[in-house]
């Protein structure tokens, strides 16, 4: 299909709390045109992120899904391409200019859902500078309900000479600023999983070299080796009248190192999700960090507990709330520390009739110094979305959001 159209997304992004973030935040793709066929180019390493095609003037797209093969090809001319440089402890971003973008993926379907695939992505800036990525990936069953999922990415970047990123820092021996340097990097993700009716286990090894960047992906951290073990147990009731309709328990352990071998993180997470009778849901999570290394500061033995509940008394009403309390590392380059954190919020949906739907959310967060309880940050995000469907062809949407962290009010109205 050839498309020259309005590429705007259906709904504005829900703002995330970024008061203590050093890496760029991931926002999911919401534009219908770019979402179509995204399962073919899905990447465990986010080697492809179609939102990196930010403001397309025109695009051509081809999707083929057959019994033996799947093909995805997309080309676009972007009027305002973003630029993201990954780092070990933080990422750097800037607004670029016009660029040509291209994504091609071929997947060979084997027996029993196995597959092998190749992919290339390319971006060429009109004023100079380009990036190339090549990927090999696959899913192979190796018996006894064991699956091997792998992905290898190789990138070659020729930076533009631009002032889009203002930084004097270095990463992997190269400058972060865009001064025409050439970089090559690689990423590797290997997942071994085994599952039956009630149990599933997954081992994950992920690696990002110090200069790994993806021209049309979302790589906000590199110089990383990560080892993850995940175990899940699931139970279903024998009767629809049982108090508990679904139960899952999860345990996950994480070990992170940089490529030089310095330990960056060690922690475990235990969580559970319960679906109760009469449309009530509960989730709990306990995180324990043995150690975390940020810019040479090593925080040890801190904990966070979180819980959420959701209730749907009818199809017209959904209400929920969450909270999280514990300890958190304050990511300040000059004075990092462990602080006392607290987050809470609510979310609800009301649909009084078939035409009108109202959604509201409020999220509060704060972090305090453990010694004197002085504030590192404090604020909240409040958002409401009103949808009114006049008929099958006409609808109205009004979004209002207030960000108390930045004292900003955002409003967006749309007719579709």
Positions of predicted regions on the chain:
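Exposed, low-structure sequence patches enriched in small/polar residues
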Residues: 55-57, 131, 151-416
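Outer-membrane beta-barrel channel domains
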Residues: 2-255, 287-291, 300
């Amino acid at each position: 299909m050839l498309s020259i159209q309005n590429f705007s997304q259906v709904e504005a992004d829900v703002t995330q709390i970024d008061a203590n973030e050093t890496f760029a935040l991931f926002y999911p793709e919401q534009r219908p045109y770019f979402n179509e066929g995204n399962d073919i180019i899905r990447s465990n390493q986010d080697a492809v992120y179609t939102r990196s095609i930010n403001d397309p003037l025109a695009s051509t797209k081809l999707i083929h899904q057959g019994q033996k093969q799947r093909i995805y090809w997309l080309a676009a001319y972007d009027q305002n391409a973003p630029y993201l440089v990954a780092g070990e402890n933080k990422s750097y971003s800037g607004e670029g200019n016009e660029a040509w973008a291209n994504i091609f993926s071929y997947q060979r379907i084997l027996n029993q859902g196995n597959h092998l695939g190749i992919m290339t992505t390319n971006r060429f800036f009109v004023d100079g500078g380009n990036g190339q990525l090549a990927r090999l990936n696959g899913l192979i069953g190796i018996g006894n309900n064991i699956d091997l999922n792998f992905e290898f990415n190789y990138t070659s970047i020729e930076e533009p000479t631009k002032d889009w990123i203002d930084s004097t820092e270095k990463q992997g021996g190269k400058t972060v600023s865009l001064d025409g340097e050439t970089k090559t990097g690689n990423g590797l993700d290997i997942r071994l999983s085994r599952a039956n009716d009630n149990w599933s286990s997954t081992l994950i090894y992920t690696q990002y070299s110090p200069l790994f960047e993806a021209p049309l992906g979302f790589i906000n951290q590199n110089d990383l080796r990560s080892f993850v073990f995940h175990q899940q147990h699931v139970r279903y009731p024998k009767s629809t009248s049982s108090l508990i309709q679904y139960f899952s328990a999860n345990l996950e352990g994480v070990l992170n190192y940089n490529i030089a071998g310095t330990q960056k993180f060690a922690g475990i997470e235990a969580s559970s999700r319960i679906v109760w009778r009469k449309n009530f849901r509960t989730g709990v999570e306990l995180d324990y960090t043995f150690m975390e290394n940020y810019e040479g500061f090593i925080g040890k033995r801190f904990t966070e507990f979180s819980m959420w509940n959701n209730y749907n008394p009818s199809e017209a009403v959904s209400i929920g709330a969450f909270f999280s309390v514990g300890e958190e590392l304050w990511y300040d380059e000059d004075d990092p520390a462990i602080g006392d954190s607290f987050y809470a919020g609510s979310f609800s949906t009301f649909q009084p009739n078939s035409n009108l739907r109202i959604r509201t959310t409020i999220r509060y967060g704060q972090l305090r110094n453990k010694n004197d309880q002085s504030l590192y940050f404090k604020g909240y995000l409040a958002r409401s979305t009103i949808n009114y469907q006049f008929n099958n062809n006409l609808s109205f949407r009004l979004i209002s959001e207030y960000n108390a962290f930045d004292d900003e009010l955002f409003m967006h109205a749309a007719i579709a």
